[in-house]
Amino acid sequence: MEKKIPRPVIKRLGLYYRCLNRLYEEGIEYVASKDIAERLGIKSSQVRKDLSYFGEFGKRGVGYNTYELMERLEDIIGVNKYWNVIVIGAGNIGSAIANYEGLRKEKFNVIGIFDADRSKVGRKIGRLIVKHFSEIDDFFKKNIVEIAVLAVPENAAQMVVDKLEELGIKGIVNFAPVKLRTNIPVEDVDITLSFKSLSFKIERNIE
Ligand SMILES: NC(=O)c1ccc[n+]([C@@H]2O[C@H](COP(=O)([O-])OP(=O)(O)OC[C@H]3O[C@@H](n4cnc5c(N)ncnc54)[C@H](O)[C@@H]3O)[C@@H](O)[C@H]2O)c1
């Protein structure tokens, strides 16, 4: 039976991948778990343990071949794949996400943006035209949609998620400050948490 990979491990794989990318660009051919750990500020035993979920990568004494490990991680976390993304809510956050070119560079293609407010329908945001949320069924029939960004007010969030789940969405990046009830993977984004964490570090003089 396949080992269940804990969510925190999956999250860290993305960090490892970015770190390896940088190491590779710096021309570092082999890397020890200690080096990855130091760069990311975590324990090297943690790095070794996380990577061991996916089989034996490194060689004792030599470490990991940077490029090979990067390629293996690409396969595991699906970086080689393009993901189709839609944004629900064409307000401040939704518009910013739909306009963000960096996502496409990371292979997350925003292919649609939807809103319930008719006055926003037809507006151009980046390369996209805002569609009414009632057009979502039709959109799913014509497109493969894997990820949705939820940028609607708190009170609309659950209703939107229920609909997206019914249509077969695979995962959600949620900006609404609410715990969603769903069986699909959700990544909550909370900017206030970053501020709280920063103020905590400042107060305790932590770098
Ligand atoms: N996570 C964070 O760090 C963070 C930061 C700021 C705001 N937020 C949250 O993100 C969400 C969006 O914030 P914003 O500033 O972009 O709000 P906004 O009011 O600018 O935009 C929300 C949009 O959602 C649309 N909408 C409402 N109900 C809808 C529905 N049922 N279907 C489709 N569209 C619908 C509205 O018409 C509006 O255009 C809010 O829940 C807000 O609390 C989160």
Curated annotation (Swiss-Prot):
Pfam families: CoA_binding (PF02629), Put_DNA-bind_N (PF06971). Keywords: Cytoplasm, DNA-binding, NAD, Repressor, Transcription, Transcription regulation. GO terms for biological process: negative regulation of DNA-templated transcription; response to redox state. NAD(+) binds at residues 89-94. GO terms for molecular function: DNA binding; DNA-binding transcription factor activity. Its main location: cytoplasm. The keyword rRNA-binding does not apply. SUPFAM superfamilies: NAD(P)-binding Rossmann-fold domains, Winged helix' DNA-binding domain. The keyword Methyltransferase does not apply. One of its GO terms (cellular component) is cytoplasm. Signal peptide: none annotated. It is found in: Cytoplasm. Residues 15-54 bind DNA. Homodimer. Modulates transcription in response to changes in cellular NADH/NAD(+) redox state. NCBIfam families: PRK05472.1-3, PRK05472.2-2, PRK05472.2-3, PRK05472.2-4, PRK05472.2-5. Belongs to the transcriptional regulatory Rex family. This is Redox-sensing transcriptional repressor Rex. It comes from Thermosipho africanus (strain TCF52B).
